[in-house]
């Protein structure tokens, strides 16, 4: 394993912490970060705003034009976008088109980075099956719903916890049972239950595993770490 080409794959059900930890690890190890689910959220947003023109021809053109900055827009965060994105991600043709783009970023990140860190469905077994480190984060549904509720409340003060809870439950059933790229833990993924862990506690647990795996420290010549 080359330290300057480290690859990390993280998956989790909604609200378990994959996104948060991926960002923290990417910053610490100077890795290119990609939230793969955001690609589907971009399409979901387009479908909701312009349902009449949302067809395969449009989708193919739109996917080619998606830029990294498009993935970070706040307009992609609402719950309705996530629900629609989950539906779109079940389309085999759309998924194949997006998979190609994600693999390109995963295996050929910009040169200024030490490698890549991706989170999302099927990352550990389809997009980055040979990742140096694979993590599957989980937490009980009440905890996950609470986290998601606090996040969404910043966007919509009228949102209700029960609605978020039901949404998370439906999302779980959909993600775990769908035929195309279902949510699942691979045998070689490290399971971490974040139910009773703070963000920092979870980060340190994952960091320690990675540090032990590559046997590095802050004085390594091959991997420059960020504070």
Language-model segments: what does each one mean?
Residues 2-3, 76, 82-83, 100, ...:
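NTP-dependent small-molecule kinase module
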Residues 8-10:
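Hydrophobic anchor at the beta1->P-loop junction of P-loop NTPases
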Residues 13:
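P-loop (Walker A) phosphate-binding loop of NTP-binding proteins
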Residues 19-20:
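Walker A/P-loop
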Residues 26-36, 49:
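Post-Walker A helix-loop "phosphate-sensing" segment adjacent to the P-loop in P-loop NTPases
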Residues 39-116, 122, 142, 146, ...:
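ATP-dependent small-molecule kinase phosphotransfer cores
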Residues 116, 132-136, 189-191:
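Short, well-ordered beta-strand core segments
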């Amino acid at each position: 394993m080359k330290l300057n080409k480290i690859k990390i794959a993280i998956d989790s059900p909604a609200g378990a912490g994959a996104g948060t930890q991926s960002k923290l690890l990417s910053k610490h190890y100077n890795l290119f970060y990609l939230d793969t689910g955001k690609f589907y959220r971009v399409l979901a947003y387009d479908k909701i705003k312009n349902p009449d023109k949302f067809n395969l021809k449009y989708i193919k053109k739109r996917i080619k034009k998606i830029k990294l900055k498009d993935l970070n827009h706040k307009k992609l965060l609402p719950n309705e976008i996530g629900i629609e994105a989950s539906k779109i991600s079940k389309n085999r043709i759309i998924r194949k088109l997006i998979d190609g783009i994600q693999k390109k970023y995963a295996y050929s990140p910009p040169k200024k980075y030490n490698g890549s860190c991706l989170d999302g469905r099927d990352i550990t077994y389809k997009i980055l099956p040979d990742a140096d480190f694979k993590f599957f984060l989980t937490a009980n549904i009440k905890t996950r719903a609470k986290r998601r509720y606090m996040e969404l409340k910043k966007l919509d003060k009228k949102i209700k916890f029960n609605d978020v809870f039901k949404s998370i439950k439906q999302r779980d059933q959909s993600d775990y049972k769908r035929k195309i790229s279902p949510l699942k833990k691979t045998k070689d993924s490290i399971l971490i239950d974040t139910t009773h862990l703070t963000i920092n506690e979870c980060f340190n647990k994952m960091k320690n595993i990675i540090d032990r795996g590559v046997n590095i420290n802050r004085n390594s010549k091959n991997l420059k770490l960020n504070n």
